[in-house]
């Protein structure tokens, strides 16, 4: 019960010190809910035209979709997906790609600004892709 209450508080205040948006940009290609359903990790793909590769973003979002925060932005990648390794760790797996933005942690704060939890984010990748023909 204590864990459930803590998670509810976590979701209600998860993005107190992070830039926020209520818009997930692009086509959603994967959703992975946290085991308790309070948080959702989202992989989205945006197409900006024929001369540039797809841009992929990973967001953490509250289950009611009221707020979301971008934690990864990359392009020229192969095979991206997300999974919850345990109750508090998000793993982003991609074979390779160019990474423009990545946060390896996510602070969860209360409405009063007090730190409630820190969610580690692990990026599992082999680095840059060998050839542009792979995309």
Locate each region found by the language model:
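Solvent-exposed coil/turn segments that connect beta secondary-structure elements
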Residues: 46, 63, 95-97
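Acidic, small-residue rich beta-repeat scaffolds with periodic aromatic anchors
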Residues: 4, 74-135
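A beta-rich soluble binding module of mature secreted/lumenal proteins
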Residues: 27, 66-71
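N-terminal secretory signal peptides
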Residues: 24-61
